[in-house]
């Protein structure tokens, strides 16, 4: 796909890290960008810098995702590009001993479930909503392409380390 100024992109986790770098790269090619993130201060500042739009989106919320895509499309048009960078991790052993009592304790399932909600299910939520929107577009090339979706996984999905099971599992799913 040739990037140009007629295209729009949504970047989840777009306020910092890989998401911000991706947004900067796309904007440098003329692509209009919408940044989805929870960090309002950084997101709004970067959106202003890139002449894009910031949408406060919690990817664990279907309602937030739907509202974010609606706002982005209203402001910069239907995206042809989705880059899923939203993610989090928690470097904690799955099981260990309490240093004071010696009792065995396990990683809290609610923390694991939140990481899965963000890293795996949040990615899928945005894929589904973006793909549905892209289906409304005319093809942009002779091959019938309507858009592109890029999902960021991690080498940890294949080569995890101690304390990364809660991060590695959903990244393997991506």
Show which residues each predicted segment covers.
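Residue(s) in the substrate-gating loop at a strand-loop-helix junction
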Residues: 154
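Rossmann-fold cofactor-recognition segment
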Residues: 49-63
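Substrate-binding pocket helix/loop in short-chain dehydrogenase/reductase
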Residues: 93-104, 108-113
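Active-site helix of classical SDR
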Residues: 127, 170
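Canonical Rossmann dinucleotide-binding motif of NAD(H)/NADP(H)-dependent dehydrogenases/reductases
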Residues: 2-33
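Conserved glycine-rich Rossmann-like NAD(P)H-binding loop of the short-chain dehydrogenase/reductase
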Residues: 29-45
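Active-site loop immediately N-terminal to the catalytic Tyr-X3-Lys motif
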Residues: 159-168
């Amino acid at each position: 796909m040739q990037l140009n100024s007629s295209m729009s992109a949504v970047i989840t986790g777009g306020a910092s890290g890989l998401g911000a770098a991706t947004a900067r790269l796309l904007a440098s090619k003329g692509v209009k960008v919408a940044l989805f993130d929870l960090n309002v201060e950084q997101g709004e500042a970067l959106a202003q810098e890139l002449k894009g739009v910031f949408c406060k989106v919690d990817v664990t919320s279907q309602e937030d995702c739907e509202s974010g895509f609606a706002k982005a499309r209203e402001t910069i048009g239907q995206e042809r590009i989705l880059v899923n960078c939203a993610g989090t991790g928690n470097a904690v052993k799955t099981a260990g001993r309490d240093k004071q009592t010696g009792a065995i304790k396990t990683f809290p399932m609610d923390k694991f479930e939140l990481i899965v909600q963000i890293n795996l299910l949040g990615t899928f939520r945005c894929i589904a909503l973006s793909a549905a929107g892209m289906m409304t577009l005319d093809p942009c090339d002779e091959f019938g392409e309507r858009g592109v979706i890029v999902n960021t996984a991690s080498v940890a999905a294949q080569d995890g380390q101690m304390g990364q099971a809660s991060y590695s599992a959903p990244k393997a799913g991506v």
